[in-house]
Design a protein with these regions (language model features):
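A glycine-rich beta-strand to alpha-helix segment
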Residues: 114-128
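Acidic, low-complexity terminal tails and accessory targeting/binding regions
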Residues: 57-69, 112-117, 133-182
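Phosphate-coordination/substrate-recognition cap region in phosphate-metabolizing enzymes
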Residues: 11-79
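Short glycine/proline- and acidic residue-enriched helix-loop micro-motifs
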Residues: 76-98
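Short beta-strand scaffold positions
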Residues: 27-28, 101, 122-123
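Glycine-rich phosphate-binding loop signature in dinucleotide/nucleotide-binding domains
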Residues: 18-21, 110-118
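Short catalytic helix/loop segments, enriched in acidic residues and glycine
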Residues: 1-12
Length: 182
């Protein structure tokens, strides 16, 4: 469930993107994404296609814990979570090969259906990092360099021979919410 802050961030995201035209809108089936997407989809008068494979990685025994709790309970530096997942060090977590394959399948679907068009994907930080890893042909563990805030925007332009990050981790709620902004 989103917190009150999360609902406010979702409304600011909707305000920022209001009036934009997207040829395709996809979203994860998970509750927090559905709640984040609602104000935006309502403002656009649109529905999103739900792609089950866009759900967040299964963190196994880490699921439901805050980062500081993971450090205390499991004795690992949660800042290195991508490395731990990629190495298979997290009990009961989704295997990295399966996660990569799942996200690759959803990416291929979205690229096929939205080739040359504006596509909006509403998903999770781990999914965004895996999409970046696949598009940039980099190991997932290196994606810890990319911060992904809640309700933030990452804009990627993909052409047949090149992927370019146009905007990353832009948080409209920082500009429209507490800070006043436009």
């Amino acid at each position: 469930e989103l917190s009150g802050t999360g609902h406010g961030q979702a409304k600011d995201l909707a305000k920022f993107l209001k009036g934009r035209n997207f040829d395709h809108i996809y979203r994860s089936p998970m509750v927090r994404v559905r709640q984040t997407a609602k104000p935006l989809l309502d403002s656009l008068g649109r529905e999103a296609e739900v792609i089950d494979e866009l759900r967040e990685v299964d963190f196994g025994v880490w699921t439901g814990h805050k980062w500081h709790e993971i450090q205390e309970k499991f004795g690992v530096d949660a800042a290195d979570w991508l490395v731990h997942l990629e190495n298979g060090d997290v009990a009961e977590a989704e295997p990295m090969d399966g996660y990569r394959s799942r996200i690759r399948g959803s990416l291929e679907q979205m690229m096929s259906e939205g080739e040359g068009q504006d596509v909006l994907v509403l998903c999770h930080g781990g999914v965004i990092r895996m999409l970046l890893a696949l598009l940039l042909e980099e190991p997932f563990s290196k994606m810890d360099r990319f911060e992904v805030d809640f309700a933030s925007l990452t804009v990627i332009e993909h052409r047949s021979n090149r992927t370019e990050i146009k905007l990353h981790n832009f948080a409209p709620w920082l500009w429209l919410g507490e800070n006043g902004g436009a």
